[in-house]
C-alpha cells in the first residue's frame, strides 16, 4: 500500500455507510452534490482514487490495485459492510472489489459502465493532450483552456479536465498522475472481471439514456456477472449521471 486514499465525509447517520468512487480524471468533488443530498439519511464518503485528486501517486494504476487500496481504506476507517457506488472507472473498481471481497458489500451500485472491454482510443488522445501541455509556460488557467481547445473542443469537458490543474507556489501542476494513467489505459479500458467471476449480492446498474457506455446489448453480460442485479435508466442523462 502506498498511502491512504483522500476522502470527503458527509452526514452522520444511516448504516451501512455509502462509499462513492469517481471516474477517470475525476475526483471526490464530482460526488459532492449527491453526497450532500444523501447526507440526511446516510453517512457518505466520496473518495479520490489513487493517481487522482488529492490521493497518492504510484505507477501501478490497475483496477486490481485500486480495489486493494479501497480495502485498506475501509480497514483503516474500521468499516465493515458498505454500500459501494462507482461511476465509470470507479464502477470498474467497485465491480472488482465486490468480486474480491463480497462480504464487505451490503449493496452495490454501478453508474453507467458495463463489465466489458471498451476501446482505449477514446481516452488516449485526451490523456496525450493533457500531457503535451507545457505547464512551465502557463500564466493562467485561461491560457491552459485556450491551449487545449483545438484538441478538446467541447468547452464543458475541458472545464472538467482542468479541475485536475492546480497552482502551487506560483507554478501549475497536474493533480492526476497522467503518465501512469496513460501507461495503464489499455488495462483500465478492459473488463475488470474474468469470464467466470460473479457477484451474487444485490446490485443496481444505473444507465444514462443518452449515454453509449451501458447499452441494451450489454445487459446479458451484466446479468452473467451480476445475477441479482437490476438496471434503471435515467432517460435524459448522459454518461455523467451525477
Listing of model-derived features with the role each one plays in the protein:
Residues 121, 136-191:
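Conserved alpha/beta-hydrolase catalytic His-Asp/Glu region
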Amino acid at each position: 500500500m502506498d498511502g491512504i486514499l483522500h476522502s470527503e465525509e458527509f452526514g452522520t447517520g444511516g448504516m451501512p455507510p455509502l462509499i462513492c468512487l469517481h471516474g477517470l480524471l475525476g475526483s471526490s468533488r464530482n460526488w459532492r452534490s449527491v453526497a450532500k443530498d444523501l447526507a440526511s439519511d446516510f453517512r457518505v464518503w466520496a473518495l479520490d482514487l489513487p493517481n487522482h485528486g488529492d490521493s497518492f501517486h504510484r505507477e501501478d494504476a490497475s483496477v486490481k490495485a485500486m480495489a486493494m487500496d479501497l480495502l485498506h481504506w475501509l480497514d483503516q476507517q474500521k468499516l465493515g459492510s458498505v454500500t459501494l457506488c462507482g461511476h465509470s472507472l470507479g464502477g470498474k473498481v467497485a465491480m472488482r472489489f465486490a468480486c474480491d471481497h463480497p462480504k464487505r458489500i451490503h449493496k452495490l451500485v454501478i453508474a453507467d459502465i458495463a463489465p466489458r472491454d471498451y476501446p482505449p482510443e477514446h481516452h488516449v488522445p485526451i490523456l496525450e493532450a493533457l500531457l503535451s501541455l507545457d505547464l512551465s509556460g502557463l500564466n493562467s488557467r485561461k491560457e491552459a483552456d485556450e491551449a487545449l481547445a483545438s484538441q478538446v473542443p467541447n468547452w464543458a469537458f475541458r472545464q472538467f479536465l482542468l479541475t485536475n490543474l492546480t497552482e502551487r507556489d506560483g507554478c501549475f501542476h497536474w493533480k492526476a498522475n497522467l503518465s501512469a494513467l496513460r501507461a495503464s489505459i489499455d488495462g483500465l479500458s478492459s473488463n475488470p472481471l474474468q469470464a467466470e467471476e460473479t457477484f451474487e449480492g444485490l446490485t443496481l446498474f444505473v444507465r444514462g439514456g443518452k449515454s453509449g457506455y451501458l447499452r441494451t446489448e450489454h445487459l446479458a453480460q451484466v446479468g452473467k456477472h451480476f445475477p441479482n442485479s437490476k438496471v434503471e435508466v435515467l432517460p435524459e442523462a448522459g454518461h455523467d449521471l451525477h
